[in-house]
Amino acid sequence: MSCSLRSGLVIVFCFILLLLSSNVGCASAARRLRSHKHHHHKVASLDVFNGGERRRALGGVETGEEVVVMDYPQPHRKPPIHNEKS
């Protein structure tokens, strides 16, 4: 087996290994999306007051996942209603 053929096979093997390892992450992400789509997991939603700021905390109840705190800015004005008949 020539040296260039061997190095080509090594590159192809590494490329296939890279694709397989990236598909593992995609499969777990697809599982997470599918579980949210079918609502198999309940999600806790809590209003958290931290130093005068209102935040919404989301976390999985059944899965025991880590709770993620997300900031939601308060609207500065009332949004317009476009479908109101005059």
From Swiss-Prot:
Q: Residues of the signal sequence? A: 1-29
Q: What induces it?
A: Rapidly induced by auxin.
Name used for this protein in its record: Protein GOLVEN 1
GO cellular component annotations of the record: endoplasmic reticulum; extracellular space
The keyword Secreted belongs to this UniProt entry's keyword annotation: yes
| Source lineage | Eukaryota, Viridiplantae, Streptophyta, Embryophyta, Tracheophyta
Tell me which stretches of the chain form a coiled coil: none
List, alphabetically, the InterPro entries matched. Answer: GLV1-2 (IPR049306)
- Residue(s) carrying Sulfotyrosine: 72
Give the disruption phenotype, in one or two sentences.
Reduced hypocotyl bending and dose-dependent altered root gravitropism associated with an altered PIN2 traffic that impairs the formation of auxin gradients, thus leading to an irregular waves root shape.
Q: What else is known?
A: 'Golven' means irregular waves in Dutch.
The gene coding this protein: GLV1
- Which residues does the propeptide include? 30-70, 84-86
GO molecular function term, any single one: growth factor activity
Q: Any one Gene Ontology biological process term?
A: regulation of root meristem growth
Protein family membership: Belongs to the RGF family.
- What organism is listed for this UniProt entry? Arabidopsis thaliana (Mouse-ear cress)
User: Which residues are recorded with the post-translational modification Hydroxyproline?
Assistant: 80
